[in-house]
Amino acid sequence: MCMEAEPPSPPAQQQEQVNPPLCKAQNPKPARLYRLVLLFVAGSLAAWTFHALSSTNLVWKLRQLHHLPTAHYLQTRDEFALYSVEELNAFKEFYDKSVSDSVGASYTEAEQTNIKEALGALRMAQDLYLAGKDDKAARLFEHALALAPRHPEVLLRYGEFLEHNQRNIVLADQYYFQALTISPSNSEALANRQRTADVVQSLDERRLESLDSKRDALSAIHESNGALRRAKKEAYFQHIYHSVGIEGNTMTLAQTRSILETRMAVDGKSIDEHNEILGMDLAMKYINASLVQKIDITIKDILELHRRVLGHVDPIEGGEFRRNQVYVGGHIPPGPGDLALLMQRFERWLNSEHSSTLHPVNYAALAHYKLVHIHPFVDGNGRTSRLLMNTLLMRAGYPPVIIPKQQRSKYYHFLKLANEGDIRPFVRFIADCTEKTLDLYLWATSDLPQQIPMLIQTESEAGERLAQMQSPNVAQRSSILEFYESGSGDIP
């Protein structure tokens, strides 16, 4: 308790009076200062925590965004439709900085050795090219590219060689694009792309028009045509055989057909390999009975598709988004916490008015890439993405496209190129597979021998089959068969 001040003595009345002393309880300054300090510290901690979490989330998203394509083949708004405008602006700033940083980044000793050897091979290749020794020059250019596949100078010079010597302007433009992805300020690559981009786009558009013509020719064949029915049945078996084969299934085409027709097990093969085939069968029947007739494709439809794909192999995970982080080679898909939002955005893009104006092959290939890039499932992402792609193609009058398992390495290579920034090679690959599938149907329903091309298991069988073909169009049929059988070299 505070004591009161004593009354002043009479002499002190003539002096200045002073204020009476305050007790500790009556002085608010220390307590108020203490509260202000606590408030400042708490506010600072809260602001720092919010900034750290926001920055971490943004950086994580940008790590995912930098995989998305920036190709000329499809418009930017189509390629980035999964993300908001704010994220795209952030992506652009991050991407420009990360690319410029990567150009000047230090290399490991092994990488430096490879680059040095690649540049040496590049100089020799250019000298041989000027000397008219094109074959040797081509081999050295390829050697340089193998040693330093992401060096701007190697990409640029090899592209120029392909454009001017090999007359392959499409592949040349692809390498110019890659060079600009790594070194955006490369003036020579910019000049080359300005020269080639419109030409390549025109070639791509003409290719799509050709596919439409073949689709229309196939559509003109009546459904009652016996050859068409047999072709559809054979293509059904081939589609399942190749799609599971891409994922590592070792069943032969004959074994796949036997399982689907008899439902009997094949000796020496695992239960999972049997169930993968049965799951694809269920999913394709679901597409034919339901999805093809639907106007919009929803997340629920995709989950139902996946539930059938994985239903026999892993019924617990079938039709469910993954709950753990997964890693796919050099690609790190989004975390499980972001899948719901990303799939909602994917669904909006899938059913948007503008997406419906894309060419069906562009639309289907891009949908395939977007879904496999999000990688929403623990397993079965590739099979589900290919089934979704074929659903979209079938709605546009195309048959389900067969991606041969012998082309597996190219398939994954083009997906990797899409992750690195250029989706056009992947779209062209899907266009190639679409054309070969159309050719398969047209060949089977033509006046040529009515035996449907099978996927030959050995070279000797292929030779025997080709020897039986008696027609002026042997070369054309040989090209079709080679695409499905050998899996070697470029797509004919």
Curated annotation (Swiss-Prot):
Q: Where is the Fido domain?
A: 297-432
Give residue numbers for the site Important for autoinhibition of adenylyltransferase activity: 247
EC number, as in UniProt: 2.7.7.108, 3.1.4.-
Motif stretch (Inhibitory (S/T)XXXE(G/N) motif): 243-248
A Pfam match is: Fic
What does its activity-regulation comment describe?
Answer: The side chain of Glu-247 determines which of the two opposing activities (AMPylase or de-AMPylase) will take place. In response to endoplasmic reticulum stress, mediates de-AMPylase activity. Adenylyltransferase activity is inhibited by the inhibitory helix present at the N-terminus: Glu-247 binds ATP and competes with ATP-binding at Arg-386, thereby preventing adenylyltransferase activity. In unstressed cells, disengagement of Glu-247 promotes adenylyltransferase activity.
Q: Where is the active site?
A: 375
Q: What is catalysed by this protein?
A: L-tyrosyl-[protein] + ATP = O-(5'-adenylyl)-L-tyrosyl-[protein] + diphosphate; L-threonyl-[protein] + ATP = 3-O-(5'-adenylyl)-L-threonyl-[protein] + diphosphate; 3-O-(5'-adenylyl)-L-threonyl-[protein] + H2O = L-threonyl-[protein] + AMP + H(+)
Among the record's GO biological process terms, what is one?
detection of light stimulus involved in visual perception
Where it sits in the cell: the answer is:
Membrane
Give the multimer and partner information: Homodimer.
Protein purpose:
Protein that can both mediate the addition of adenosine 5'-monophosphate (AMP) to specific residues of target proteins (AMPylation), and the removal of the same modification from target proteins (de-AMPylation), depending on the context. The side chain of Glu-247 determines which of the two opposing activities (AMPylase or de-AMPylase) will take place. Acts as a key regulator of the unfolded protein response (UPR) by mediating AMPylation or de-AMPylation of Hsc70-3/BiP.
Protein's recorded name: Protein adenylyltransferase Fic
Taxonomic source organism:
Drosophila simulans (Fruit fly)
